Design a protein with these regions (language model features):
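Extracytoplasmic small-molecule ligand-binding "clamshell" domains
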Residues: 4-79, 148, 212-213, 223
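Short, well-ordered beta-strand segments
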Residues: 15-20, 102, 119-122, 167, ...
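Periplasmic-binding protein-like
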Residues: 19-21, 96-103, 179-218, 236-248
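Ligand-binding cleft/hinge of the Venus flytrap
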Residues: 28-30, 42-51, 128-150, 178-182
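Acidic, polar ligand-binding/catalytic clefts
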Residues: 39, 43, 52-114, 186-191
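Extended ligand-binding regions for polar small-molecule ligands
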Residues: 39-48, 106-109, 113-127, 175, ...
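A conserved helix-loop-strand patch within extracytoplasmic ligand-binding domains
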Residues: 51, 59, 91-146, 204-206
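A ligand-binding cleft/hinge motif common to bilobed small-molecule-binding domains
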Residues: 62-65, 78-87, 131-134, 158-194
Length: 248
């Protein structure tokens, strides 16, 4: 019986999903196997669609050329759709995520306006980088310096060591980092923005997989599967599924 299952698994066509390390969405467990919210959601969705999924680590800054060249089929990893709707073909949004600012506990920064003249670190090419660079939102003050770092973990190291006054990222990422490294940062109550998280396919990918994925993820949200997966990783899982008001 088991051998039949394995055979069936290996005969399914493979979807290559590219991501970088972004706990709790996607990371390697103790055995070096990719796991996390996005890995579990993708595995289940593609299984329902008749595919098996191969999760590969990519250079996040090269994600667009990798998906356009066909080296990977799609991109996941807590990937915000906001401002990128024309760059990719999207499945989703399947999760609503808050982009927030975090500071050290003893900081005198309590609201976004307190960031004026301060130094803030972000992971490069992420949504917060654009928010602080472009400053199209009048709530965003002029920083002293915006420091863009290649790896997610580095922004927290910079904050912990006092090289910067604040960091900006997805709330889930900050909460996860504090859990993993026993760090104590304070998250500002006022979010930078609430973004929809999606699965990105190449703009000219007309295989229909993206549309099928979008439908399957929505079915998983409706039938409680997504909630079950998210609650393994995050408290208050329901709030991450409130995607109806995002407007795309």
């Amino acid at each position: 019986k088991n051998t039949d299952n394995t055979k069936e698994e290996t005969e399914r066509p493979v979807i290559t999903l590219g991501s970088d390390n972004y706990p709790p969405y996607i990371y390697l467990n103790e055995d070096g196997v990719p796991t996390g919210i996005d890995v579990e959601l993708a595995t289940e969705a593609f299984k329902r669609m008749g595919y098996q999924v191969d999760v590969v680590q990519i250079n996040w800054e090269k994600k667009k050329e990798l998906v356009e060249s066909g080296e990977i089929d799609c991109i996941m990893g807590c990937f915000s759709m906001e401002g990128r709707l024309d760059d990719y073909r999207w499945a989703g949004p399947y999760i609503a995520s808050r982009q927030v600012v975090a500071v050290n506990e003893n900081s005198d920064i309590y609201k976004l306006s307190d960031l004026e003249g301060k130094n803030l670190a972000v992971q490069s090419t992420t949504k917060p980088e654009g928010i602080f660079l472009n400053r199209t939102d009048e709530r965003i003050p002029k920083l002293g310096n915006l420091i863009s770092l290649g790896h997610r973990e580095l922004i927290y190291t910079f904050l912990g060591k006092g090289y910067v006054d604040a960091v900006a990222a997805h709330e889930e990422s900050i909460v996860q980092y504090m859990k993993d490294y026993d760090a104590s940062f304070r998250i500002l109550e006022e979010p930078l923005m609430i973004t929809g998280i999606g699965v990105a396919f190449a703009k000219d990918d007309d295989r229909g997989i993206c549309e099928q994925m979008s439908q399957t993820l929505e079915e998983m949200r409706q039938d409680g599967t997504s909630l079950k997966i998210i609650e393994k990783y995050l408290d208050d899982p329901q709030k991450y599924l409130e995607v109806d008001d995002l407007g795309y």
